[in-house]
Amino acid sequence: FALDIKNAVEQDGDPAGEKFVMLSNIIKVSAMHRVSDIYGPIRYTKFDDFETTGEYDSQEVAYTAFFAELEDAIVGLKSFEGATQFAPFDMSALGGDIAMWRKYANSLRLRLAMRIVKVNPSLAKIEGEKSFSSDAGLLEATDMYINTGFAHPITVISGSWGDIRMGAEMESILEGFDDGRKEVYFNPSDDPALNGAYKGIRMGIEIEAKGQYLGHSSIGSVIDGETIQWMTISEVWFLRAEAALRNWTGAGDAKTNYEKGVKASFSQHGVGGADVYLTDNTKTPKDFVDALNPANNIAYPGDVKIAYNTAGTNEQQLEQIITQKWIAMFPDGQEAWSEFRRTGYPRIYPVKVNNSGGKIDTDIQIRRINFVQDEVNTNGANVTTAIGYLNGPDNGGTRLWWDIPGSNF
């Protein structure tokens, strides 16, 4: 996959391959911003062939390159709208439609703009407002999926391995909100003692035997065959809602965008009742009760509601937006984790047992992943330089460049 992208990008200068270069750059940014959001510094602008050594960019430099490449693609692909040569090779839900790829790239730019809003609010606003003013438009009719040709990894991990079950936060929020998406996201428990309830597991608990919790809720039909979710219409509406809350030009109305985001998520999963759901101003996430070990019971640390509160503070409104965004992103754990790190929402339970030796804060939890040992062994000098770009040591407690503590406003 990486080799295909590299070969396409190297066609730069060949008029016949120009559109493939720009499309490849969109795919490259789609993949590599996730890598950067895991580790921080990455090999990107100086990447050359597949040699085992190479220089790293700081995350700030990488994001600057992401924005430049997306802008080039969004603008450059306009002249190719209507071209069909890409369609036979497009493994995404966009079907080779160049206009739709421009919308996706523009929506991705909005995601990345919001990601840096705390570390560089002026650049975030500039890039976000470019997304709103661009003639490319944003995703509104088609969710972005990739058809991989192989079983979704979560299907294997949940089913064949039996290593994933519903989380305690999902149980608290979906059950507390009486949210119909739970029936798509998860299967009812098959432990007879649980009477078909939707039951989750708290993070960081000690499990003496894996089989203890196997009867809890497994992944449901949300995992559909061989497709992997890259970006949804609902996410774009929630990005618009936050942008409106931040008074970005062209973002529209926060409440309207929030409600469109919820409705888009319900529609995506074939769940009804969104209109009634959005009027509920009483339900809140429920406290978590571990069906097997009451020592793991814990009260939910907040009282966020569903109906949008236009009279609330910016933080209260943002908590509503991100909580619903977090629900809607499932099962895209990478983006949900990034948004939790950026905003602190939704409110999640602290891990029960912290085995990090003091390196990772129990409450704010893991912030990044260490550089892989093989890279340290084979590219040590450059990894050492990359560690210098971080805000601390190479461990899971160190915040990324865009991960700024404190208020969101």
Residue ranges and their predicted role:
Residues F266-F409:
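C-terminal functional modules
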